[in-house]
């Protein structure tokens, strides 16, 4: 048993979708979350920038004595997961493999769509992961760069959001039966995405799927937390504390969250 917290990292608020599912499925666990909102979105960034920024967040979480790191960010997972895993002696998990595996199980027509940031689509990690498991599946990938900005600005229910989602997803409508939400920001737009794609299309939340793998790793390494009466979940953001708080408290349905501003660039010294 291990009562140290689980660390989650993301380029902003998107990883809160993973945090919500983690708190629901694993209620005994404490979390420390870092969102690099100041440098979001990561999608247009170069591979070198994404690696450097991810190490900033990883080292920040290590300073909080976490027992596991969850890359609650598809872009970071695509670009840095294997690099970070090789360097650390604690478990590190990403969100791409769990999402891809679930989509393979759910599709009935062998036509899967993937929507993600530009960097994730460029990496082709979802396509490669699915191809390794099943050569019969056709994967249609689509970058939706505007979605992250909508979520980070807390405009998920606006008319602009409806129009952007509808226009962005038009190339996939009628062509797939399963759609991977390949960015942890995207579940915050789930209702609009479902409305656009049609109720017959199954939406796969890659972050939520990852929590099942987190549970397996906790058991395997015997680092589950004891049941406890008090929890101190800590959330950090590199910019926009008030906006982050508004989104986090609404999405997690938890009031009075412990949210602080964090400077993380100095945590990159050794990498």
Swiss-Prot record:
Any one GO BP annotation for this protein: cell wall organization
Gene3D superfamilies named among the record's database cross-references: 3.40.50.1860
Associated pathway: Cell wall biogenesis; peptidoglycan biosynthesis
Record-annotated active site: 73, 183
Keyword annotations from UniProtKB, A to Z: Cell shape, Cell wall biogenesis/degradation, Isomerase, Peptidoglycan synthesis
Origin superkingdom: Bacteria
Pfam families linked to this entry: Asp_Glu_race
Top EC class for this record: isomerase
EC annotation from Swiss-Prot or TrEMBL: 5.1.1.3
Example of a GO MF term: glutamate racemase activity
Catalysis performed (reactions): L-glutamate = D-glutamate
Binding site for substrate: 10-11, 42-43, 74-75, 184-185
Function summary: Provides the (R)-glutamate required for cell wall biosynthesis.
Family designation: Belongs to the aspartate/glutamate racemases family.
Name assigned to this protein: Glutamate racemase
Record organism: Lactococcus lactis subsp. cremoris (strain SK11)
Species lineage: Bacteria, Bacillati, Bacillota, Bacilli, Lactobacillales
